[in-house]
């Protein structure tokens, strides 16, 4: 029997995360018109998982599911040589272009903002290339201005939402002395002041109890952002762009989230080539696609991780939200696993790779038995034991 993990081995408790607690999270592509959103989405769509891999899901034309590349998964497949290989995926939604005044319904404003509310994170595409053939909605290329336009629209929509919430709470407080109503009202006032000060919700210093309430609101500025700076192929190849320093300075002043420079023109060219020709082109020009990096960064940004189940029949990534405990992780495989959870037998990927086999991991005392309070970590390799009424153990 594997040793039980001691309390000192447990990961330190984390503050709750802003956002939905689900293993089915998605990221949306956001930006002004003509910045490269749809081109980026079309490139990603070429890499998307065939619909038949999800027989019980209808994938909308503006949605794509793409494999998350991972050398650890590849290594496990080489080790076990399974009959079936199932990697993790990222769901990406293409969202219509925003225009100034969207919060008040301009353009496709209300639909646009409701689509952002439905996703869990944002790929914010910025135009950092000049092209007379591609018009800009504001008649000039200025990525920092574009950043401020979208930031303001999202904050204004959040202010509108929070003000409506305040109004509703005040009506309810007249009819009830419920302390929870008062707490929510105080929080809403703080959030409104925070937004009116030009700050996004995700950068607020919120208590755990605040976050639990905020997560019921699905505020637009609570969602994590990855900035994708779309430049010309020439600028991308020479790794130099006149707009990039100003973009970097702005992002550092506004939360310091991840910036990934890329080129839709280059990625589209590469996507249209046969794989061997694309590899040769990249080698000759000392350049590489950043689409894999974008996918992995987006996956992590919305707080998704995955654990592995591994054996000769199947190696599979089971994606879960960070901070998920073992019984809930087991439930992603089957509800019976969660309902009748006994324990999780856990190997760390690094231990398996270092030692070379499950038997060696067990011999080294690194094959652990974890209970209901164990928080699953990224790349854990897990075998669940469960027992349900009328059933047996797995």
Swiss-Prot record:
Any GO BP: negative regulation of defense response to bacterium
Subcellular location: Cytoplasm; Cell membrane; Cytoplasm, Cytosol
CDD domains to which the protein is assigned, alphabetical: TGS_YchF_OLA1, YchF
Keywords linked to the UniProt accession: ATP-binding, Cell membrane, Cytoplasm, GTP-binding, Hydrolase, Magnesium, Membrane, Metal-binding, Nucleotide-binding
Intrachain disulfide bonds: none
Binding sites annotated in the UniProt record for GTP: 129, 263-265
Residues binding ATP, per UniProt: 34-39, 56-60, 94-97, 230-231, 263-265
Molecular function GO terms recorded: ATP binding; ATP hydrolysis activity; GTP binding; GTPase activity; metal ion binding; ribosomal large subunit binding
A GO-annotated cellular component: cytosol
Domain OBG-type G: from-to ranges: 25-282
Transmembrane parts of this sequence: none
ATP-binding is among the record's keywords: yes
Pfam families: MMR_HSR1, YchF-GTPase_C
Binding site for Mg(2+): 38, 58
InterPro entries per the UniProt record, alphabetical: ATPase_YchF/OLA1, Beta-grasp_dom_sf, G_OBG, GTP-bd, P-loop_NTPase, TGS, TGS-like, TGS-like_dom_sf
Essential cofactor(s): Mg(2+)
Protein family (similarity comment): Belongs to the TRAFAC class OBG-HflX-like GTPase superfamily. OBG GTPase family. YchF/OLA1 subfamily.
Annotated NCBIfam families: redox-regulated ATPase YchF
Binding partners and assembly: Monomer (Potential). Interacts with GAP1.
PANTHER family in the cross-refs: OBG GTPASE FAMILY, OBG-LIKE ATPASE 1
Protein name: Obg-like ATPase 1
Originating species: Oryza sativa subsp. indica (Rice)
Lineage: Eukaryota, Viridiplantae, Streptophyta, Embryophyta, Tracheophyta
């Amino acid at each position: 029997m594997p040793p039980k993990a001691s309390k000192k081995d447990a990961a330190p408790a984390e503050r709750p995360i802003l956002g939905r607690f689900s293993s089915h999270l998605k990221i949306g592509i956001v930006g002004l018109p003509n910045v490269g959103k749809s081109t980026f989405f079309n490139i990603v769509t070429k890499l998307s998982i065939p619909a038949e891999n999800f027989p019980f899901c209808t994938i909308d034309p503006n949605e794509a599911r793409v494999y998350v590349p991972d050398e650890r998964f590849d290594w496990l497949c080489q080790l076990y040589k399974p009959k079936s290989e199932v990697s993790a995926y990222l769901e990406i939604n293409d969202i219509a272009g925003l225009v100034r005044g969207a919060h008040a319904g301009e353009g496709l404003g209300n639909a646009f903002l409701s689509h952002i509310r439905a996703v869990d994170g944002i790929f914010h595409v910025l135009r950092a290339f000049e092209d007379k053939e591609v018009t800009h909605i504001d008649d000039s290329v200025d990525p920092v201005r574009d950043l401020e336009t979208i930031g303001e629209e999202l904050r204004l929509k959040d202010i509108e939402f929070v003000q409506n919430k305040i109004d509703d709470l005040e009506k309810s407080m007249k009819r009830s002395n419920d302390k929870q109503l008062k707490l929510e009202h105080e929080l809403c006032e703080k959030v409104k002041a925070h937004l009116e000060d030009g700050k996004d919700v995700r950068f607020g210093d919120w208590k755990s109890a605040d976050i639990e309430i905020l997560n019921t609101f699905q505020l637009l500025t609570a969602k994590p952002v990855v900035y994708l700076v779309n430049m010309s192929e020439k600028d991308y190849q020479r790794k130099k762009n006149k707009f990039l320093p100003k973009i970097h300075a702005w992002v550092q002043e506004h939360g310091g989230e991840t910036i990934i420079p890329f080129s839709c023109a280059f990625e589209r060219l590469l996507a249209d080539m046969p794989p061997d020709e694309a590899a040769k082109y990249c080698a000759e020009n000392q350049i590489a696609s950043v689409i894999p990096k974008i996918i992995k960064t987006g996956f992590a940004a919305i707080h998704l991780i995955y654990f592995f189940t591994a054996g000769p029949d199947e190696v599979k990534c089971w994606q879960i939200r960070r901070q998920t405990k073992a019984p809930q992780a087991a439930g992603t495989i089957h509800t019976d696993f969660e309902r009748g959870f006994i324990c999780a037998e856990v190997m760390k990927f690094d231990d398996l790779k270092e030692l070379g086999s499950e038997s060696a991991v067990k011999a080294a005392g690194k094959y652990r038995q974890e209970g209901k309070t164990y928080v699953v970590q990224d790349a854990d390799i897990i075998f669940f034991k469960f027992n349900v009424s009328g059933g047996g153990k797995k």
